């Protein structure tokens, strides 16, 4: 009886705990400097299921966590995986030599995994 109860409790917990596998993942990112600002292209993979659960944005952050830019994704990409979107006009402070890219989805929020990109 104790084993059955423990197994049932663990099964319920596993269903209610978000899985890293269901979070949006950054597969690649590139940066290009143009004048005083930067353009970023970010490739994301996420098992979009429609409007109820999809990758809905990504951000460019300084190493200290300061958000430098945000790209909102306006619709699901169920049939386009992975997909790449760009953001231009991002001002990166002097002295910042790398940025951290974070993906967001409509159910899990910010992904636990980030992508660090060195700026050249």
Language-model-derived ranges and their functions:
Residues 109-119:
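Edge beta-strands of extracellular beta-sandwich domains
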